[in-house]
A protein has these predicted regions:
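Solvent-exposed alpha-helical segments and adjacent loops
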Residues: 1-218
Length: 218
């Protein structure tokens, strides 16, 4: 495994396919912005979206940051999505809803329940993409993948180890890929995302009907 400290850019030696080329029979196709574009399709309409923010921060101020960010996500979706704290989500909702999870496995219990089943592993200030490991408090990730509770539905992850970084995730230029790992340096100084700001890594997953996997580096 390659350990990469935050702020080190990965240049992947593999050639990533465009959207849809490696999907097989997978119903979900990504990328991140695809969730915002096609969630109103028939199979999405019958399974509404629930936005779940973590409540496990030590500081109540950080929990409020998560809740405020959940409202931002709802506004982007332009949908009557339900917003709930992680302690208030039922198993029925986890199985029947598309999930948007905000926080980390340490601060969001729903996130923690599915963390080992996600194609990218998020630990304590670490993010592992295939055989690449990023470390640092000032890093984060946006990712779309099948919902481990119901693989016909999606889970959209907004995660950062510093609440101040999470608060500004929408200033990171993202959407055209299935995932993006970023650092504080990826945040735009203005109100709009800056495509010239570097990410640590972004890419697509190898998509099979029941499993999505990131491309390993050689």
């Amino acid at each position: 495994k390659r350990v990469l400290h935050s702020y080190e850019k990965v240049i992947s030696p593999v050639s990533l396919p465009p959207r849809g080329e490696a999907e097989g029979d997978s119903k979900l196709v990504g990328p991140i912005y695809g969730i915002f574009m096609d969630y109103k399709m028939e199979f999405r309409r019958k399974d509404r979206i629930i936005i779940v923010y973590g409540t496990g921060n030590e500081r109540e101020e950080d929990n409020r940051t998560y809740e405020d960010f959940a409202q931002k996500v709802k506004e982007h979706l332009e949908d009557a999505a339900v917003i709930k704290g992680d302690e208030d989500v039922s198993m029925e909702e986890k199985v029947s809803k598309n999930l948007v999870l905000i926080g980390t496995p340490q601060t969001n219990r729903v996130f923690r329940e599915i963390s080992t089943a996600l194609p990218i592993k998020i630990g304590d200030e670490t993010i592992q993409v295939a055989n690449r490991i990023y470390k640092g408090k000032g890093i984060g990730i946006v990712m779309v993948a099948p919902n481990p509770f119901n693989k016909e539905l999606f889970v959209l992850i907004y995660s950062a180890f510093e609440p101040s970084v999470l608060r500004n995730i929408f200033s990171v230029y993202h959407g055209g890929t299935d995932y993006i790992v970023f650092s504080k340096e990826s945040l735009s100084e203005g109100s709009e995302p800056d495509p010239n700001k570097p990410s640590l890594e972004e890419g697509y997953f190898l998509k099979n009907p029941n499993k999505w996997e990131p491309f390993p580096s050689k």
